[in-house]
From Swiss-Prot:
This is Eukaryotic translation initiation factor 3 subunit B. It is found in: Cytoplasm; Cytoplasm, Stress granule. Residues 107-396 are annotated as: Sufficient for interaction with EIF3E. Keywords: Acetylation, Cytoplasm, Initiation factor, Phosphoprotein, Protein biosynthesis, Repeat, RNA-binding, WD repeat. The modification Phosphoserine is found at residues 37, 40, 68, 75, 79, 84, 105, 114, 117, 135, 137, 147, 222. The keyword 4Fe-4S does not apply. It comes from the Eukaryota. HAMAP family: eIF3b. The modification N6-acetyllysine is found at residues 192, 271, 347. Belongs to the eIF-3 subunit B family. Residues 53-62, 100-110 have a biased composition (Basic and acidic residues). One of its GO terms (cellular component) is eukaryotic translation initiation factor 3 complex.
Length: 797
């Protein structure tokens, strides 16, 4: 079984790094000059020995008297003894010098140890003050193959480097060619653009025939500013005719050293990952789900089956926290201290890994091409590492980002097709495009006071809202991308808060608006319904004066459900958005014990659940005629998960939220309980998603029309399955009975073999035969006399 914890580095690298973890870091070998001066080293060690003998406390080591300050600084600070500092691990001349420089008493101790006279070595060690000193020297056969970059990479990158002064210079091409009359204006424009990245201390505009040449040189106060300018200003569009190309001046040397001869790249072997969507070809069309139990120590993958779940794969310590499926179900992501691993295929082999120390959160792009990881541990001003976007196919890092402390996950939100992703900061909405990972049109949107935004699941439309500012009303804006055209703006007044809820197909947008009308107390909620598929995007409003607990759209329909009121008077209302724009109340159920709404992925059916504090009350509702099919309870249920087909639903009690009664129960969409699966310290269950169907809407309609024809085939398969299950049950019981008979026969034979031993132990009395003869029985009757006393109630006094 493949080790799931091997994420950030191959096993070979771990084995190479193992000696470094077991031994202290070896010091760098001394110079040839120091190695050759063996006599002076001995003299210094003799002085050190005299100083050590003169000290009253032998535990305190004396610094060599003849050692200079430079040599002191060069010796490792972490070395506990001068011996370990003078015994280099490198071979050759340095090793010979180190051997000469060793303390004479140390050689005497080795000779005494080789002769076996430990009693003589001990007094010498006490005289030298080395009785309790541990040895941190490397063994003679130790080979340190761990480089300094691996151990001290974060420290070495900040070491001083020699600079020739041109690291701070950049070259800007495609600059407008102007004469002396417009040169000053051009300089002001250039300075305004490039001074955002740092202080410009010098500039140079080459001229020819009275005009600039079309390229300029800018020098910054720091090389970091120059790098920042290249990163952000390259590709900047000044106007329709001029788009800047920015490079470092030092890049000239890099490009001039490129060989004129073309080296044919090595052909990379194709890595066959197998069929990553094999589960979709399962004959019974069953779904898979993952289960984490034993407080996270074990993770299993199961086939969902009506009778019992069928285990596919089970591994210990597969993940360190939790798991997550990709949006189309292709990959299973596991979390580790050193990064993320992706698994897939019929054997769940490791597909890819991404090294991100301390990763806590991830997010996939809807197209499964990119992975976003977040870690609070790694982030620097020069090298942003808090958020990293990875290419899943290649495993390469695409870009890193900083993370604000007040941000909410997911920080980046993806468009429905994965072509764009966006993030919100103070008064700014930044939209990036793939695969370049650069800003759309090289600039962010300045939106003063922006509070929240959300992508449409059905198109490249982004919705955002801005609160009121003095006399300016709050507004909700719909923007088409990449053109940035505002297709609808809705002004709102007396707004406290807004929430954006998209219908799964992007047909509707509901903006839940909490507001405080003038002259009234309390909060009133409006549901602003945007009909996205109609011209000019008309808006309808539903007002509710009760407290709103939950809101949810039907995934593939035009209905939505609202939980409102306060316990114990909680109600659920179902609304239907008609084609003419009228919003109709279909049904309202009173006195519901629910705080969450869970729609089936296929629509029509919904589960109203009272999770955690409401003790797991469940109501299964069919919204086609608004009937309650069943009311049940899973005590202290913490989660509800629909399967991708909408046929089954799982309720569970997670060990993460409740420490007892941890289990998951499987129900039909009608509310009929099929299974109760108890798992020790059960933590999490996640269904494996399915990719979108390849069938067209016309084909789906035709299948629904011919459902009766297919249902006969399904019923026949069900009967065969039941018959097969019955045969399997009978066969299993027959096998169990046969196993019992064999065990009973073996026990009887063993019992008879031990008869002689029993006779000997019981003085020749055959106790086996005492109960076999009825004539030897003695019958004894024992009578118990019971006195009954009746006391009338009236005569108790």
């Amino acid at each position: 079984m493949q080790d799931a914890e091997n994420v950030a580095a191959p096993e070979a690298a771990e084995e190479r790094a193992e000696p470094a973890r077991q031994q202290p870091v070896s010091e760098s070998p001394p110079t040839d000059e120091a190695a050759g001066s063996g006599g002076s080293e001995v003299g210094r060690t003799e002085d050190a020995e005299e100083d050590a003998e003169a000290r009253p406390e032998p535990e305190v080591r004396a610094k060599p008297a003849a050692q200079s300050e430079e040599e002191t600084a060069a010796s490792p600070a972490a070395s506990p003894t001068p011996q370990s500092a003078q015994e280099p691990s490198a071979p050759g001349k340095a090793e010979a010098g180190g051997e000469q420089a060793r303390h004479p008493s140390a050689r005497a101790e080795e000779e005494g140890g080789s002769d076996g006279s430990a009693a003589e070595a001990e007094p010498r060690a006490l005289e030298n003050g080395e009785a309790d000193e541990p040895s941190f020297s490397d063994p003679e056969d130790f080979v340190d193959d761990v480089s300094e970059e691996e151990l001290l990479g974060d420290v070495l990158k900040d070491r001083p480097q020699e600079a020739d002064g041109i690291d701070s210079v950049i070259v800007v091409d495609n600059v407008p060619q102007v004469g002396p009359d417009r040169l000053e204006k051009l300089k002001n424009v250039i300075h305004k653009i490039f001074s955002k990245f740092g202080k410009i201390i010098n500039d140079y505009y080459p001229e020819e025939d009275g005009k600039t040449k079309g390229y300029i040189f800018l020098e910054y106060a720091s090389p970091a500013h120059a790098v920042d300018a290249v990163k952000n200003a390259d590709g900047y569009k000044l106007d329709k005719q001029h788009t800047f190309r920015v490079n470092l001046f030092t890049d000239f040397d890099k490009y001039m050293t490129i060989s004129d001869e073309w080296d044919i790249p090595e052909k990379q072997p194709f890595k066959d990952l197998g069929n990553l969507r094999y589960w979709l070809e399962e004959a019974e069309c069953r779904d898979q789900y993952s289960v984490i139990f034993e407080s996270g120590d074990r993770t299993s993958i199961f086939w969902n089956d009506v009778k019992d779940p069928v285990s596919i794969e089970e591994r210990a310590r597969w993940t360190e926290t939790y798991v997550r499926w990709s949006p189309k179900g292709t990959y299973l992501a596991t979390f580790h201290q050193r990064g993320i691993a992706l698994w897939g295929g019929d054997k769940f082999k490791q597909i890819q890994r991404f090294s991100h120390q301390g990763v806590q959160l991830i997010d996939f792009s809807p197209c499964e091409r990119y992975l976003v990881t977040f870690s609070p541990l790694m982030d620097t001003q020069d090298d942003p590492q808090a958020i990293i976007i990875w290419d899943i196919l290649t495993g390469h890092k695409k870009r890193g980002f900083h993370c604000e402390s007040s941000a909410h996950w997911p920080i980046f939100k993806w468009s429905h097709d994965g072509k764009f992703f966006a993030r919100m900061t103070l008064d700014t909405l930044s939209i990036y495009e793939t695969p370049s990972m650069g800003l759309l049109d090289k600039k962010s949107l300045k939106i003063s006071g922006i509070k929240d935004f959300s992508w449409s699941p059905g198109g490249n439309i982004i919705a955002f809202w801005v609160p009121e500012d003095k006399d300016i009303p709050a507004r909700v804006t719909l923007m088409q991308l990449p053109t940035r055209q505002e297709i609808r703006v809705r002004n709102l007044f007396n707004v406290v808060d807004c929430k954006l809820h998209w219908q799964k197909n992007g047909d509707y947008l509901c903006v839940k608006v909490d507001r405080t009308p003038k002259g009234t107390q309390g909060v009133v909620t409006n549901f602003e319904i945007f009909r996205m598929r109609e011209k000019q995007v008309p808006v309808d409003v539903v007002e509710m004066k009760e407290t709103i607990i939950a809101f949810a759209w039907e995934p593939n329909g035009s209905k939505f459900a609202v939980l409102h009121g306060e316990a114990p008077r909680i109600s659920v209302s179902f609304y239907h958005v008609k084609s003419n724009g009228k919003i109709e109340l279909i049904k309202m159920f009173d006195k519901q014990q629910a705080n969450t709404i869970f729609w089936s992925p296929q629509g029509q059916f919904v589960v109203l659940a009272g999770l955690r504090s409401m003790n797991g009350a469940l109501a299964f509702v069919d919204t086609s005629d608004c009937t309650v099919m069943n009311i049940a309870e899973h005590y202290m249920a913490s989660d509800v998960e629909w399967d991708p087909t909408g046929r089954y639903v799982v309720t569970s009690v997670s060990w993460w939220s409740h420490k007892v009664d941890n289990a998951y129960w499987l129900w039909t969409f009608q509310g009929r309980l099929l299974q109760k699966n108890n798992k020790d310290r059960f933590c999490q269950l996640l269904w494996r998603p399915r990719p979108p169907t390849l069938l067209s809407q016309d084909q789906i309609k035709q299948i629904k029309k011919d459902l009766k024809k297919y249902s006969k085939i399904f019923e026949q398969k069900d009967r065969l399955s039941q018959s097969k299950a019955s045969k399997e049950l009978v066969e299993r019981r027959r096998t169990m009975m046969e196993d019992f008979r064999q065990y009973r026969k073996m026990a009887q034979e063993l019992y008879m073999k031990q008869k002689n031993e029993r006779l000997e132990l019981r003085g020749g009395v055959d106790t086996d035969e005492l109960d076999s003869n009825v004539d030897d029985w003695e019958e004894e009757t024992i009578e118990f006399f019971v006195t009954e006393e009746v006391i009338p109630l009236g005569s108790q006094e």
